[in-house]
UniProtKB/Swiss-Prot annotation:
Protein name, entry field: Gamma-butyrobetaine dioxygenase
Family according to the record: Belongs to the gamma-BBH/TMLD family.
Main EC class the enzyme belongs to: oxidoreductase
GO molecular function terms attached to this record: gamma-butyrobetaine dioxygenase activity; identical protein binding; iron ion binding; zinc ion binding
Cofactor annotation comment: Binds 1 Fe(2+) ion per subunit.
Residues bearing the modification Phosphoserine: 351
Annotated Gene3D superfamilies: 3.30.2020.30, Clavaminate synthase-like
Origin: domain of life: Eukaryota
Pathway annotation: Amine and polyamine biosynthesis; carnitine biosynthesis
Keyword Chloroplast: no
Location relative to the cell: Cytoplasm
């Protein structure tokens, strides 16, 4: 972005700065915001990209004492003699117009979301390419954010491969099941995933108040028959539910449900949480699905008259997930790693037969969306700059 200032002036009793740009656009900036964001070394620590100015020292009713400009910068003197400079590009990027704010938020959070159903073309990349090449790593994480799932092929059929992916993004998310965990049938299993039975559509770990955002599953050994993976785009299904039955959508997005998980693994644990099955942001957009029927508690903290309507709404939601139109079925092969958005996708597994030895083995891990998005922003900057 290369912006040129045509004119800058103080308005509204010097409480606002107005800029006229060479491209014909206009921008307004509050004086209090400008003073708060002074970029001088007394007010801003450039080595940490962090504000030093204390809010206690900020006059919220401040006015500009003097304002000058050239094409590239604005120069402001404040009533106490403090002096600030602001670059044109920096100001234009932070314009308060609705269009500019939406554009910057899009750059920061990359909200583009591609909904899908049974027609999904599963994004696929090579495991080693993702580890060793920034362009491929960027494609991996940008597709993960946009589509919600990416398959990586070519990993070794041994434990430890997803630890490499964790290091590629930064670090993995430790839970009560460990840094990584083994999905295989176990005697006296402490999780339904560690059985050979069918797993219905679910998100992992809603028993935590902050469920892991991304899940990584590496296929080390696969059964010959059964064990197919099933996934569904929860955000897409939520949209259809809202269209088909707004009342059911309203119930699931307003009713807090208790989840529990008690046992021993990495250490002993007794976890409780409360979530709405469909979690919305302040604009009414779905931001997370919290649903695991296995760990949904017997405790249900609602008035009795709301119990049956809740079950009816939840059943309709689950029936939609299981319709052929929305679910996608595939089988992992040894060396495959699937990485997916645990806040958006629900996943399941078809049953398989137990043998005298372990016939199916996946290694799993979690990552936090903050860590993934951090790496995605860094990779995006590198790729866009050609570094």
């Amino acid at each position: 972005m290369h912006c040129a200032i045509l004119k800058a002036e103080a308005v509204d009793g010097a409480r606002l700065m107005q800029i006229f740009w060479h491209d014909g656009a206009e921008s307004l900036y509050p004086a209090v915001w400008l003073r708060d964001n002074c970029q001088c070394s007394d007010c801003y620590l450039h080595s940490a990209k962090a504000r030093k100015l204390l809010l206690e020292a900020l006059d919220v009713n401040i006015r500009m004492d003097d304002l000058t400009f050239d094409q590239k910068k604005v120069y402001i003197t404040w009533p106490n003699g403090h002096y600030s400079e602001f670059e044109a590009n920096w100001l234009k990027k932070r314009c308060f117009s609705q269009e500019a704010r939406a554009g910057l938020q899009g750059e920061l959070f990359l909200p583009e979301c591609q909904y899908w159903g049974s027609e999904l073309q599963l994004p696929t990349l090579n495991f080693e390419d993702v580890l060793n090449d920034d362009d491929h790593a960027y494609k991996w994480l940008s597709s993960l954010k946009k589509v919600g799932i990416v398959r990586l092929t070519g990993a070794a059929d041994k434990r430890g491969e997803i630890i490499k992916l964790g290091k590629r993004i930064g670090f993995l998310y430790l839970t009560f099941y460990g840094h990584t965990w083994q999905v295989q049938d176990k005697i006296d299993a402490n999780n339904v995933a560690y059985t050979t039975g069918k797993l219905s559509f679910h998100t992992d770990y809603p028993a935590l108040h902050h469920p892991p955002g991304v899940q990584l599953l590496h296929c080390i050994k696969q059964t010959v028959t059964g064990g197919d993976s099933e996934i569904v785009d929860g955000f897409n299904v939520c949209q259809k539910l809202k269209e088909k039955n707004p009342q059911a959508f309203s119930i699931l997005s307003s009713t807090f449900v208790d989840f529990t998980d008690i046992g021993v693994d990495y250490c002993d644990f007794s976890v409780q949480s409360k979530h709405k099955i469909i979690e919305l942001d302040d604009k009414g957009q779905v931001v997370r699905i919290n649903f695991n029927n296995a760990t949904r508690d017997t405790v249900f903290d609602v008035p009795i008259e709301r119990v049956q309507p809740f079950y009816a709404a939840l059943k309709e939601f689950v029936d939609l997930m299981n319709s052929k139109e929305y679910k996608y079925t595939f089988k992992m092969n040894p060396g495959d790693v699937i990485t997916f958005d645990n806040w958006r996708l629900l996943h399941g597994r078809r049953s398989y037969e137990a043998g005298t030895e372990i016939s199916r083995h996946l290694e799993g891990a979690y990552a936090d969306w903050d860590v993934v998005m951090s790496r995605l922003r860094i990779l995006r900057q590198r790729v866009m700059n050609g570094n």
